[in-house]
Regions:
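Active-site oxyanion/phosphate-handling segment shared across diverse enzymes
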Residues: 96-117
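A short secondary-structure junction motif
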Residues: 8-11, 15, 106-109, 146
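Amphipathic, well-ordered alpha-helical segments in soluble domains
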Residues: 4-11, 33, 37, 95, ...
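Amphipathic, non-membrane alpha-helical segments in soluble helical-bundle scaffolds
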Residues: 1-2, 24-31, 85-96, 126-129
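Charge-rich, low-complexity N-terminal segments
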Residues: 1-27
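Short, contiguous alpha-helical
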Residues: 17-65, 110-149
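A short small-residue
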Residues: 14-15, 75-83, 116-119
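Short, helix-capping/interhelical loops that line the mouth of catalytic, cofactor-
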Residues: 44-96, 103
Length: 149
């Protein structure tokens, strides 16, 4: 995740770039959303009860995690991780600092720490780390497409 967080920082200078053929929202939205997801999911893992984790098979999760792919435009972000209408660069920077710290701290959590994803179901720590990687890369690919890189 260190590489992905560095890319988020790199793309900050393009925060206002928009290409409506690729995405309805600007680069800043994708950066802010990605960081909100990392930070909120870490909090969910930290606050979870490891004894409540139950492994359950999910075809969608298996395919997404195996291929490292999330289809574009198929799911809407939950309100809790949607950026505000006005996204401040300073807010993205502070979320980036927070995300770097939380990514470091995730290793110290119990392996059965968990959070419930709306599509993939209950994820343990290992699965959550994979989700965060796949999800962040998904939004970074959209940013690259917006910028025509």
């Amino acid at each position: 995740m260190k590489s992905e967080l560095n890319k988020i920082e790199h793309y900050l200078i393009h925060r206002d770039s928009l290409n409506k053929e690729v995405s309805k929202v600007a680069v800043a939205w994708h950066l802010d959303h990605s960081l909100k997801v990392i930070n909120k999911i870490y909090d969910s893992l930290k606050d979870s009860n490891p004894d409540m984790y139950k492994n359950k098979f999910s075809t969608a999760r298996t395919l997404s995690f195996t291929f490292g792919y999330i289809p574009r435009g198929k799911a809407a972000a939950p309100l809790s991780v949607q950026p505000p209408d006005t996204i401040m660069t300073a807010d993205i920077v502070s979320q980036l600092v927070e995300a770097r710290e939380k990514v470091r701290k995730i290793e110290s959590l119990d392996d059965q720490s968990n959070f419930k994803h709306p599509v993939f179901g209950q994820l343990n720590k290992k699965q959550t780390k994979r989700f965060l990687e796949v999800h962040t890369k998904h939004h970074l690919k959209i940013v690259k497409s917006i910028l025509k890189e």
